[in-house]
């Protein structure tokens, strides 16, 4: 090592000047006095604590969690009002029965599409027109919104019975998004 760079050079002087020398006779008595005057027992607080706001906070958190779980279950099991308006309900309401007797010829009447379109709601009409135009059902491409957690960036929209000027304005405004 280079001269004058010993890390222990000045340490000895500090210990010599600051350390107190004790007599060997009093050492045991001094240590006993030191440990008898121990204040560690006063550091522990054995008194009963008041529950206070922590209980109220816990109850608030529990109530919030319960409400969230109930909301989740309601969202899971409650039918949306649109489910009762489906194609099956409106088409099955008009069931065609053909009476047949023994030996008679069974004939099933072919109901034209125009009769179905006239008899049922506009929604069924629009869904049927979509299926005829695209060879796939609108409900196969889409689903009812249930939660934000399962969102997709792909959008499917069906427009029917809109004015030509509205259609042109939608085409120009949605061109950047499609």
Swiss-Prot record:
One cellular-component annotation, GO: host cell nucleus
One BP annotation, GO: DNA replication
GO molecular function: ATP binding; ATP hydrolysis activity; DNA binding; helicase activity
Signal peptide: none
Swiss-Prot/TrEMBL catalytic activity: Couples ATP hydrolysis with the unwinding of duplex DNA by translocating in the 3'-5' direction; ATP + H2O = ADP + phosphate + H(+)
UniProt organism field: Cottontail rabbit papillomavirus (strain Washington B)
Disulphide bonds in the chain: none
Protein name, as recorded: Replication protein E1
EC number: 5.6.2.4
Main location: host cell
Keywords: ATP-binding, DNA replication, DNA-binding, Early protein, Helicase, Host nucleus, Hydrolase, Isomerase, Nucleotide-binding
Compartments (UniProt record): Host nucleus
Residues annotated as transmembrane: none
Job description of the protein: ATP-dependent DNA 3'-5' helicase required for initiation of viral DNA replication. It forms a complex with the viral E2 protein. The E1-E2 complex binds to the replication origin which contains binding sites for both proteins. During the initial step, a dimer of E1 interacts with a dimer of protein E2 leading to a complex that binds the viral origin of replication with high specificity. Then, a second dimer of E1 displaces the E2 dimer in an ATP-dependent manner to form the E1 tetramer.
Keyword Isomerase: yes
Enzyme class: isomerase
InterPro entries (UniProt xref): PPV_DNA_helicase_E1_N, PPV_E1_DBD, PPV_E1_DBD_sf
Family: Belongs to the papillomaviridae E1 protein family.
Pfam families tied to this protein: PPV_E1_DBD, PPV_E1_N
């Amino acid at each position: 090592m280079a001269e004058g760079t010993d890390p222990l050079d000045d340490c000895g002087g500090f210990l010599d000047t600051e350390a107190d020398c004790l007599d060997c006779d009093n050492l045991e008595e001094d240590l006993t006095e030191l440990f008898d005057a121990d204040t560690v027992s006063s550091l522990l607080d054995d008194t009963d604590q008041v529950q206070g706001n922590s209980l109220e906070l816990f109850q608030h958190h529990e109530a919030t969690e319960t409400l969230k779980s109930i909301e989740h279950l309601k969202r899971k099991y409650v039918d949306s009002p649109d489910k009762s308006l489906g194609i099956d309900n409106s088409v099955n309401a008009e069931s065609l029965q053909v009476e047949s007797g023994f030996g008679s010829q069974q004939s099933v009447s072919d109901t034209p599409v125009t009769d179905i379109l006239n008899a049922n709601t506009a929604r069924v009409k629009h869904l049927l027109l979509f299926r005829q135009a695209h060879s796939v059902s609108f409900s196969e491409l889409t689903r009812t919104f249930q939660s934000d957690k399962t969102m997709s960036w792909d959008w499917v929209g069906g427009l029917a019975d809109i004015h030509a000027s509205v259609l042109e304005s939608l085409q120009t405004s949605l061109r950047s998004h499609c």
